[in-house]
Swiss-Prot record:
Family listed: Belongs to the bacterial ribosomal protein bL12 family.
PANTHER family registered for this protein in UniProt: 39S RIBOSOMAL PROTEIN L12, LARGE RIBOSOMAL SUBUNIT PROTEIN BL12M
UniProt KW Ribonucleoprotein keyword: yes
InterPro entries the UniProt entry points to: Ribosomal_bL12, Ribosomal_bL12_C, Ribosomal_bL12_C/ClpS-like, Ribosomal_bL12_oligo, Ribosomal_bL12_oligo_N_sf
Pfam families: Ribosomal_L12, Ribosomal_L12_N
HAMAP family xrefs: Ribosomal_bL12
The species this protein was found in: Chlorobaculum tepidum (strain ATCC 49652 / DSM 12025 / NBRC 103806 / TLS) (Chlorobium tepidum)
Protein name: Large ribosomal subunit protein bL12
Function in brief: Forms part of the ribosomal stalk which helps the ribosome interact with GTP-bound translation factors. Is thus essential for accurate translation.
Subunit structure of this chain's protein: Homodimer. Part of the ribosomal stalk of the 50S ribosomal subunit. Forms a multimeric L10(L12)X complex, where L10 forms an elongated spine to which 2 to 4 L12 dimers bind in a sequential fashion. Binds GTP-bound translation factors.
Length: 126
């Protein structure tokens, strides 16, 4: 196995928290950002088609705004939705606001939001 393949395998074994820490460390070491670059043409075209884009939105992000009073139930639901371990799910809930799911269909986003709200969480769809 080449060193790159070995590195990819090792990175694949990291937990979500460890991967996040790795990204932060790389950003600091090399002075870069993991945020996607925005193209100038896309920025220029956005204001003109913004109203149409809002109506045609097909993918939504489910954002956990706060856990509310029943944090344990919210952690259980976050674990079920994301497949995270107990510690990672607890860290996500404690660190709210956090994105629970990204780029899901409207139906799935509403279903996830309902599950979280039923558990006592405050949720937002973006």
């Amino acid at each position: 196995m080449s060193s790159i393949e070995t590195l990819v395998e090792e990175i694949g074994k990291l937990t979500l928290t460890e991967a996040s820490e790795l990204v932060k460390a790389l950003e600091e070491k090399f002075g870069v950002s993991a945020a996607p670059a925005v193209m100038a043409g896309a920025v220029m075209a956005a204001p003109a088609g913004e109203a149409a884009a809002a109506e045609e939105k097909t993918e939504f992000d489910v954002v956990l705004k706060s856990a509310g009073a029943n944090k344990i139930n919210v952690i259980k639901v976050v674990r079920a939705i994301t497949g995270l371990g107990l510690k990672e799910a607890k860290d996500m809930v404690d660190g709210a606001p956090k994105t629970v799911k990204e780029a899901v269909s409207k139906d799935e986003a509403e279903k996830i939001a309902k599950e979280l709200k039923d558990a006592g969480a405050e949720v937002e769809l973006n």
